[in-house]
């Protein structure tokens, strides 16, 4: 895979440059474009993944199915498909926006900051998983309600972006509808 870059954003959310992905993620990470996707199987179960210990930020933390950064000239939908294939070895369809104006800033225990405008999507998996161990160390198909209860009871056990995404009532309800096939 070619070297990934992040699309830098100004405070109005407009692109204002690019920076190599690993150079961008520091203690002073600039605002940049990202995405987050919650992937469900045909039984309505959510794919929860555990980030590889090789990840620069939040290694070993449980999170939603796949996250990443669109590349210059790439749509968010194309970027989600690219990362689902790269991280999970999976094909997805039925991409549906869940929380299009999600923005967050969080600092991991090592001091690395995430500072992202990060639209959230849901999708269906249409192939088997083939996890990339450099990206994902474990995964589990879980009932969405069990995951939401776990997040509510132990938010520290999940990535901060996952916790913040479902703290939005509308996003939580849209994920429930998607899981139930509505």
From Swiss-Prot:
PROSITE patterns: NUDIX. Mg(2+) binds at residues 67, 87. Mn(2+) binds at residues 25, 32, 69, 114, 116. Pathway: Isoprenoid biosynthesis; dimethylallyl diphosphate biosynthesis; dimethylallyl diphosphate from isopentenyl diphosphate: step 1/1. Its cofactor is Mg(2+); Mn(2+). Gene3D superfamilies: Nucleoside Triphosphate Pyrophosphohydrolase. Its EC number is 5.3.3.2. Residues 30-164 form the Nudix hydrolase domain. Its main location: cytoplasm. CDD domains: NUDIX_IPP_Isomerase. Binds 1 Mg(2+) ion per subunit. The magnesium ion binds only when substrate is bound. Signal peptide: none annotated. It catalyses: isopentenyl diphosphate = dimethylallyl diphosphate. One of its GO terms (molecular function) is metal ion binding. Keywords: Cytoplasm, Isomerase, Isoprene biosynthesis, Magnesium, Manganese, Metal-binding. It is found in: Cytoplasm. Coiled coil: none annotated. InterPro entries: Idi_bact, IsopentenylPP_isomerase_typ1, NUDIX_hydrolase-like_dom_sf, NUDIX_hydrolase_dom. Homodimer. This is Isopentenyl-diphosphate Delta-isomerase. It comes from Citrobacter freundii. The lineage of its organism: Bacteria, Pseudomonadati, Pseudomonadota, Gammaproteobacteria, Enterobacterales. The gene is idi.
């Amino acid at each position: 895979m070619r070297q990934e870059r992040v699309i830098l954003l100004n405070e109005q959310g407009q692109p204002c440059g690019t920076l190599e992905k690993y150079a961008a993620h520091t203690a002073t990470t600039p605002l940049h474009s990202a995405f987050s996707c919650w992937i469900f199987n045909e039984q309505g179960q959510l794919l929860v993944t555990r980030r590889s210990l090789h990840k620069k930020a939040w290694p070993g933390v449980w999170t939603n199915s796949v996250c990443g950064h669109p590349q210059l000239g790439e749509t968010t939908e194309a970027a989600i498909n690219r990362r689902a294939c790269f991280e999970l070895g999976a094909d997805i369809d039925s991409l549906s926006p869940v929380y299009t104006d999600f923005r967050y800033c969080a600092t991991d225990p090592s001091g690395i900051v995430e500072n992202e405008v990060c639209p959230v999507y849901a999708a269906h998996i249409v192939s088997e998983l083939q996890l990339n161990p450099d990206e994902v160390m474990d995964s589990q198909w879980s009932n969405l309600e069990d995951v939401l209860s776990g997040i509510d009871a132990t938010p520290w056990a999940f990535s901060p972006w996952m916790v913040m995404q479902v703290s939005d009532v509308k996003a939580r309800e849209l994920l429930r509808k998607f899981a139930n096939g509505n």
